[in-house]
């Protein structure tokens, strides 16, 4: 969610005509292409945000 939130804004700004469902499909493909090392900071940030929310 952390990664997709930022990426969704970028894609929507670059492609204002694109439907939300199309953006989601594109983001899904992009996410799958990332390596585990590239994904790790986003997982860590999500965990940090979850911990803050629980407090």
Curated annotation (Swiss-Prot):
GO molecular function list: calmodulin binding; DNA-binding transcription activator activity, RNA polymerase II-specific; RNA polymerase II cis-regulatory region sequence-specific DNA binding
Assigned keywords, A-Z: Activator, Calmodulin-binding, Cytoplasm, Differentiation, DNA-binding, Nucleus, Sexual differentiation, Transcription, Transcription regulation
DNA-binding residue intervals: 1-55
Pfam families according to UniProt: HMG_box
Compartment(s): Nucleus speckle; Cytoplasm; Nucleus
GO BP terms: cell differentiation; sex differentiation
TM spans (from-to): none
Cellular component, GO annotation: cytoplasm; nuclear speck; nucleus
Membership in a protein family: Belongs to the SRY family.
Function comment: Transcriptional regulator that controls a genetic switch in male development. It is necessary and sufficient for initiating male sex determination by directing the development of supporting cell precursors (pre-Sertoli cells) as Sertoli rather than granulosa cells. Involved in different aspects of gene regulation including promoter activation or repression. Binds to the DNA consensus sequence 5'-[AT]AACAA[AT]-3'. SRY HMG box recognizes DNA by partial intercalation in the minor groove and promotes DNA bending. Also involved in pre-mRNA splicing.
Assembly description: Interacts with CALM, EP300, HDAC3, KPNB1, ZNF208 isoform KRAB-O, PARP1, SLC9A3R2 and WT1. The interaction with EP300 modulates its DNA-binding activity. The interaction with KPNB1 is sensitive to dissociation by Ran in the GTP-bound form. Interaction with PARP1 impaired its DNA-binding activity.
UniProt-recorded name of the protein: Sex-determining region Y protein
Origin species: Meles meles
